[in-house]
């Protein structure tokens, strides 16, 4: 795991910032979000990274991130919505950052595009709970999560999403350990989704209607 981290930092250099998702979904499960002790659901590498010296974690009790690098403070701002103003996705897009996936098909960056576009098949749901910060201080926190409407078929259409974003200009794909590493320019990723949503607001969900 350390070898992988060393490779990342070698590539991004002193001016780069490494960000990894450390999602816990704590408030969705009525659990306390402890920034130091709440384990991530995102795999061994992400859990290993968040425990490294100098790594900081965001305050989001649902979709947190572990961050280290030259511009880390830009990504550590508090936010009232998981995919809203000042969230990691917004800063990554504005900073023209890169978005990389190791295998898997789900892309949470898509939800940022959906919230900013205000898609009809999601709505803001408020979650509240206890957050314990890095100084072991507890306080109440409330955050909005732009969740799916369950009365319609709003499951993500992964085939459509992947086909769309894999057509961005700077998309790169490499085989690795029996799966794929995909790299996107975050701004291009968001803009192509907005372009498609302008044409058809159902294009990113299973309830896909070609004549919507």
Where are the language model's segments positioned?
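N-terminal and secondary-structure boundary signal
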Residues: 1-212
